[in-house]
Amino acid sequence: MAVTAGTGSSNSGGFYSFGSAGSAERALGSVASGSTGTINYALALTNNTGAALTSFTLSYDGEQWRNGGVTATHSLTLQYGFGASYAGVAWTTAGAGFDFASVMNSTTAGLVDGNAAGKVAGLGGTVATNWAAGDTLWVRWTDIDNTGGDHGLAIDNVSMSFTAAAVPEPSTYAMLLAGLGAVGFLARRRRA
């Protein structure tokens, strides 16, 4: 499916690069309407650090660029999972703090300024995981085809960071070995 530049004025289903007319500042979004069915946009990241990662922190801004003319709240739901390919992922919902819910829900259909009235900044949080070196993490936002008109929802300013498993300093190993040696010495001394 192609990505179409739009301001939120169209109710045609599909992927959109939403933004104000003539602006280079854009957000990746969708209108899951008509024949599109559910729309997913995904990001694949491979852990090439050489170490296990114990968590990831994700933040983004949710933006609504179109009011579909319905009073129902529509959402982008964030899910994640691990797998070599998109088709092989067992998806896990990250939690409510990661989801974006539409903010303009009225019977008047039309465009919404996603950088102002339609914006919810700072969504996301931290997810504990066991992300092995070499594994691929998939993150996706899901926009379902709701009954009636669909709102135009988008993501912008996506940021991710990761936490590696703690690796003991060499001095920690030296102290551990010295401590074990002292315990062994004391045990031998008591026997004598």
Where are these regions (language model features)?
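Terminal, low-complexity interaction segments
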Residues: 50, 63, 81-164
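His/Asp/Glu-rich, glycine-adjacent segments
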Residues: 4-6, 71, 86
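Beta-strand signatures of extracellular beta-sandwich domains
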Residues: 77-79
